[in-house]
Amino acid sequence: MFLNPYIKYVSKNVISRKRIKFLYQGKIVFVRLYNGEVNSVVKPYIMRQFFKKSMFVFLFGGFVYGALEILWRGYTHPSMLLLGGICFLIIYGCEQRQTKYISPLSRAAVYAAFITCLEFIFGLILNIGLGLDIWDYSDLYFNLCGQICLLFSLLWFVLSMLCIYLCKALRFFFEK
């Protein structure tokens, strides 16, 4: 059983005590146990690395989304940091998969639809359900319940194109 890129900087002497074979391929260390199970020393390391990376991506997406909203309308709401983090984390996860067979335009359209759906769900919960009135698109054309509109869906499409290339840059940053 081979494990993927989360095992990078594991020292040889710690793992060799647990009867592990090493197979080096570039900078990434692939680990295989004799019995095919995940090592009790290696598994927590993998989970810590995965959690740190996911938390960084989540916070990065949340703060970038919050900064964009502040630039666009002058203020933001803390729940928008949560929404931005969730959206970027899921987009980053999708971009980690083999996406070379799908065009960037198609991926951006799917991501824009996904972000619009999440914006609608958050709008129903926060604006209509809890009455926070964080945003209101009622005065814009082609809106749905005042929570989403076509104009912002197109804006999400453009920003999704930028996110695709930002995900590539982050992946390069993490692999260094």
Label each PLM-derived region with a short phrase.
Residues 2-10, 23-176:
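Aromatic-rich, lipid-facing transmembrane alpha helices and their immediate juxtamembrane interface loops
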